[in-house]
Structure formats: structure tokens, C-alpha cells
Amino acid sequence: MKNIVKPGEVLKTAKKEFDQAYDQAKTKYQTAFKRIKPLAELDTLPVPPLVRAAYSDRMAWIMANMVQLAYVNFEENELEVERLDYALRSGAFNLIRTFSNKGTQAFLAKNDEFAVLSFRGTQPDKWEDIKTDINAIREKTVDGKVHIGFKTAFDDVKDLIIEELRINIGKMPLYITGHSLGAALATVATRELETEFSDQIAACYTFGSPRVGDSKYEKSVKAPFYRIVNTTDIVTLVPFLLGTFVHVGDARYLSRRKAEDGTYLIYRGMPNFIRTLECIAETLSALLHLSNPLSPWINAHSMEIYVEKLAGIAKQRNKPN
């Protein structure tokens, strides 16, 4: 009887290990977004396709940079707004407006060719963000069932966003993007804004997105949709309610392996066998280095890693002949 492990003890141990891994990764995760780089480097590449757009390595990199800029704390003071504005102007974008209500933050920007709506992701020290993430009750809509936390969070800024789009972007193509919680908000935004702006939504790019709704909801999203996943990114596996929540969009998988040219491999679709092997390899590597086995699963969610990998791929594939 001494060898029998109670289910409660297993859950308690798993929670303890997760908390330890989370604490180890938290500092890196939070500080990753403080090193905001200007966007001038993006001008070295040709302009990607804009209307009802197919997947583009260039646009994926642009959107990844836009998502990283969403982590500027522009809601805190004017200095941070100026910081965001400077970074955008360095890449020939103009800041139209920032949005902040409760736990939801986003900004709208545009250049001469297209507009971008970028949502901020989960901040580990913000209770509103955490509460949104864990509120996995599904709300029934005419288009299926959607995570009520994500839907409510988008509704907090929906009217303001629609107003700004009507006034400021005209008939411009609109790209929508986000990371983590922001990816979920971008998903909901894409579906909600299709009612009025369906002819203008060029594409939605998400990074490290959780599951957002059921299969009916997924099918209701008509805009081009690209879901980018980095190796063991743990957030892409939640909510852990398989069969009820599903992912939206055409997946692109960023591998831990590199090609001969030194760039990371990117797969179209989700190569489940390869991902399983890489997850095992990452976990074993952490154990061999005496780290918490969950650390690589959390570290892989860093937006900085997404930007680094996508930058290399975009530059390599768009080299002049």
C-alpha cells in the first residue's frame, strides 16, 4: 500500500514542477519584450502580397515585429507611447491609436500600403491577463462556441477599434496579429470584424496561440489565417480540453532543427511526428542539464524566439539573385 500514489499527490507534484519552471522562465519571458528594435531593417525586403494574402515569410516577420511592439507599455505614460511611435516610424509606419481597457491592449498602425491591428499577449504579472487565460468556459454564438474569456476581452475594445477602422484606414488591406493571449484576441477580432471589413482583411497571423473555440467556430473564420507555432510552445496546447477547443488557421511549425543555410526549418502544417520527437529531445536536454523538464516548453513561448527564427527565414528566402 505504501507504493500507491494518490491522484491528488500526482497533481500536487505536477503543479509544483510547473510553478518552478514558470519562475525560472518568468524573468526571461518578461524582459524579452523590453529590447524593442526599430523596424528599419524590414525595408530591405520586397513588399509582400496584400489583398486576401497567401502566406508570406516577409509578412510573417513584419507581423512578428508588430506583435513585439505591442508589449511596449503604452498605456502607462506618454513616454512609452513615443517609444512605440518611434519604433513604428523607423519602419515607415504611422501609429493611429493605442487601445487599453481592463486587461486588453492593442494598437492600430498603417503605412502607405496596409494597416496593422496588433494585440498584446499575456503578461505574467497582470491578473487580468491570467484571469482571461484560465476562463475557459465556452460562450455559444451563432457561429459556434468560443472561449468566453477571449471573447469578453476583445469586446472590451471592439467598439473603439471599429470606430478607428472606419475613420482611418479607408479601403486599405488590414492585417491582424497577436501573440499568446493576443493571438486569441486576434482570432476573435478577425471573426468579429469580418462582418463589416471582410473585403479588407488581408490575413491574420498568430504566434503561440491557444485554442479559441469549437470546430464550428473555426470554420466560421473566412479570412486567410496563418498560425505559427514554435517547437514546444506550451501555450499552443491549451486549453487542455481536447475535442472541445480547436485551433484556427493554416499552421506553420518552426522547428528546433536548422537547414544547411543556418536558418531554422519551417513546415507547412503541423508535423506531429517531428514535433513529438523534438518535444522529447527538448525535455531530455533539460533533464541532462539538471533543469526543470518544463522549462523548454515555457521558454519556447517567447516572442523574441519567434522573431529571431522568422527573421532568418525571411532574409534567406528573399536574398537578391
Regions found by a protein language model. Give the residues of each.
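Non-catalytic, mobile gating and regulatory segments of ester bond hydrolases
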Residues: 1-177, 181-321
